[in-house]
């Protein structure tokens, strides 16, 4: 930046702006925890909006959801190298070392990925990530989720989804889940936690021609009673 006389800077104002989708005068993020820094230089205004924290550590009663790291490879592959986990998944070979390596590296590189830790014994039992945050629509995806079979059928899925939804709704208005057309297991799990299916089937470039259903949970519905489905 060019050097300027101190008198050039008239004032610096830090503003915390709680935004809503209905407030047209405020930034259209649908977020309630974003900070705007407005700097006024002789009438010129420059604004900076901080990014949400996409990789916090979230602690539940029995599971900790923490940022994934490259050091997690061995233990997470041990948890995910079970063919049964992936048998109805759009990528059924993810139990192989090559298949899981692609999944794992994508999670680490995304800077939005998580590992699930069983608090009782410190073991890694699964993974998930946020993806594709859209500030203008206030929408973000939760996906790439798996749990070791030792934690199927209990409260583990509800617990990790609840932790991730609670955090997502500090800055987003809608959370979506892309679920493969043949993945009846995950479709059932989405229904149990209050996900509503959008009409039709969807595809996207990162998944090729694989058809998906999209389930969504809105912040309004979640706060008006949907959270109780995850208790």
Report each predicted region and the residues it spans.
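Conserved beta-strand in the GNAT
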Residues: 115, 123-132, 141
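A short helix-loop-beta-strand connector motif used in the catalytic cores of GNAT acetyltransferases and
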Residues: 105-115
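Conserved GNAT acetyl-CoA-binding A-motif
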Residues: 170-179
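Conserved acetyl-CoA-binding loop-helix of GNAT-fold acetyltransferases
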Residues: 154-167, 188, 192
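A short, well-structured alpha-helix characteristic of acyl/acetyltransferase catalytic modules
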Residues: 46-102, 220-231
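Conserved active-site alpha-helix within GNAT-family acetyltransferase domains
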Residues: 183-199
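A short, internal acetyl-CoA/4′-phosphopantetheine-binding micro-motif in the GNAT/acyltransferase core
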Residues: 117, 143-155, 180
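Conserved catalytic-core motifs of GNAT/GCN5-like acyltransferases
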Residues: 178, 196-212
């Amino acid at each position: 930046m060019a050097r300027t006389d101190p008198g050039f800077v008239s004032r610096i104002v830090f503003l915390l702006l709680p935004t809503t989708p209905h407030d047209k005068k405020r930034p259209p993020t649908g977020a309630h925890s974003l900070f705007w820094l407005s700097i006024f230089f002789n009438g010129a205004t420059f604004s900076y909006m901080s990014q949400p924290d996409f990789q916090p550590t979230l602690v539940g009663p029995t599971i900790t959801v923490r940022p994934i790291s490259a050091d997690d490879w061995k233990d997470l592959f041990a948890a995910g190298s079970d063919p049964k986990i992936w048998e109805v998944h759009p990528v059924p070979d993810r139990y192989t070392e090559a298949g899981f390596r692609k999944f794992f590296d994508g999670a680490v590189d995304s800077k939005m990925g998580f590992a699930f830790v069983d608090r009782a014994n410190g073991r890694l039992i699964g993974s998930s990530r946020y993806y594709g945050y859209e500030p203008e629509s206030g929408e973000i995806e939760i996906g790439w989720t798996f749990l070791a079979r030792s934690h199927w059928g209990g409260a583990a899925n509800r617990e990790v989804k609840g932790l991730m939804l609670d955090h997502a709704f500090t800055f987003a208005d809608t959370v979506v889940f892309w679920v493969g057309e043949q993945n009846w297991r995950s479709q059932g799990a989405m229904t149990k936690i209050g996900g509503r299916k959008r009409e039709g089937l969807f595809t996207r470039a990162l998944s090729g021609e694989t058809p998906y259903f999209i389930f969504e949970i809105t912040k309004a519905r979640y706060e008006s009673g949907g959270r109780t489905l995850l208790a």
